Structure formats: C-alpha cells, structure tokens
Amino acid sequence: MAEITASLVKELRDRTGAGMMECKKALVEANGDIELAIDNMRKSGQAKAAKKAGRVAAEGVILARVENGFGVLVEMNCETDFVAKDAGFLGLANEVADFAAANKGTTIEALQAQFEEKRAALVAKIGENMNIRRVAYLDGQVIAQYLHGAKIGVLVAGEGSDDELKKVAMHVAASKPEFVNPEDVSAEVVEHERQIQIDIAINSGKPKEIAEKMVEGRMKKFTGEVSLTGQAFVMDPSVSVGDFLKSVNTSVSNFIRLEVGEGIEKKEEDFAAEVAKITGGNA
C-alpha cells in the first residue's frame, strides 16, 4: 500500500475541489495513484473535470528569440524569485537564449554542457542552485511570440498577420490548449475521456446503449475545449479562436507554451515544522 501523504491529499483537493476526506478515501482506493483517483472520482460524480497536474513551484525565467520564421523558447530555473531578478542570473539566461537562437536545434543537454562552467561559477557566487531546464524550437512562415512577465512564454507558427497571431499567442498563454485543432486530439486521449464519460452516464442510471449515444455530444465539446481553434477566444468569448482566425484570414500550424517550473514541486514544510527547525525544537 502506497503512503498517502498530506501533500498528496492536498494536491488532489486542489485539482478536484472535493473534500479532504473524499480525496483521502479516493487515494487509498487508488493505492496512491492520483490520476486514477481523479478518474474514479469523476466517474462517481465526486469531481468534475480536474485541473491539470504540474503545480508551478520553481522560480526562474522564460526567454524568447524570434527571427525569419524561426523561434526559440528557453527556460532557466533558480530557487527564489529574488535570484530570478538578479542581473547575473538574467545575463546568463540571455546568453543561453542567444546561443540557442544562433545554433538552431541545439539539444538541452548540449546547452547545459556549453554553459556549465558559467553556471557553476554563478552558483558559487550567488549561493543558490540554478539550471537550464528546457529549450523548444518552432519553425513557420510567420512566428509570433508572447511573454507574460517572463513567467510564461508562447510561440505561435502560422500564416497571415503577425499582429493577429500575437493575439492568439496571448490566448494560448491564458487558456493552455493542448492541441491546435479538435481533430488533432490523439485517439488515446479521446478514448480515455470517452470511457470516463460513459461511466459517468451509466452511474447516473442511464442504460449503456443510451450512455454511449449521449457521450458523442460530450466528446465533441471535450475536443473543442482542449484544442486551440475550438476554444472560446479570450479577447471575444462570443467566437471561437478558429472563427476569429478565419475572420482575419490567418491560420495556425503549431504552437509552443512554456511556463516557469511546470511539473516541478519544491519541498514544502508546514508552519509548525518551520518554527521547530528555527528554534531547534520539535513540532
């Protein structure tokens, strides 16, 4: 039996909005598998669509470079927001971004090796760990970029107006689509959601045959919600992004979205533990 920690229960609660006891029970039944617990809670009606995993806990910056139909995003992490604003840290991050832009296709491993000496020297000087975490490249006829406070970076590739594609990049930053078009949603993702929706309908008392028919409409809504062109446009929710693009004679072929610290969790201590640590006592 997997250990059900308080932090795991809290994460499930944050992602589902369900009560603490319901979350703990679901985790016990799923043997600590949070994704399985979410699926089971959705099937039983205890939770609706869950928030995506990947609480942002690390600090750092996202930098972008765009030129002549080519763009690159680089993420560099550190431990505190204070260091994320340090001139030395930002200087190194900009060097990395410039190098990645000038050497298209450089892998993250190659980037890390290229700047390891400078990184180690800066760590020794500042006294805080830092690392070059991710690099992502995008090609296209037109590349638009959007940076939200150096914490979220988006590149959008397409054809048409750069100004209109930048609006779409802002939408991607806010709405986090996973695919470009509804038809791009992978068969595996669609089938997983379909089975959940069928179980939800059956658990509500519907016969299996009727449940399966009901699900088709729900699946169309689901693929629209997770795809860029199917989402309601943040700047005008009365139209979809797809309709907006058609109205301005612009199209999107691909996009990349990076957010500082996605998928990284810092070690957290409760307040009592922090006090005990400071005073040398026990919590």
Curated annotation (Swiss-Prot):
InterPro entries: EF-Ts_dimer_sf, Transl_elong_EFTs/EF1B, Transl_elong_EFTs/EF1B_dimer, Transl_elong_Ts_CS, UBA-like_sf
A single GO molecular function term of this UniProt record: translation elongation factor activity
A GO cellular component annotation in the UniProt record: cytoplasm
UniProt-listed PROSITE patterns: EF_TS_1, EF_TS_2
Transmembrane stretches, start-end: none
DNA-binding as UniProt keyword: no
Keyword Cytoplasm: yes
Coarse class of the protein's main subcellular location: cytoplasm
Chain intervals for the UniProt region annotation (Involved in Mg(2+) ion dislocation from EF-Tu): 80-83
Subcellular location: Cytoplasm
Keywords for the protein's UniProt record, in alphabetical order: Cytoplasm, Elongation factor, Protein biosynthesis
One Pfam family from the record: EF_TS
Coiled coil, from the record: none
Entry's family note: Belongs to the EF-Ts family.
Free-text function comment from the UniProt entry: Associates with the EF-Tu.GDP complex and induces the exchange of GDP to GTP. It remains bound to the aminoacyl-tRNA.EF-Tu.GTP complex up to the GTP hydrolysis stage on the ribosome.
HAMAP family tied to this protein: EF_Ts (MF_00050)
Protein name per the record: Elongation factor Ts
Naturally occurring in which organism (per UniProt): Haemophilus influenzae (strain PittGG)
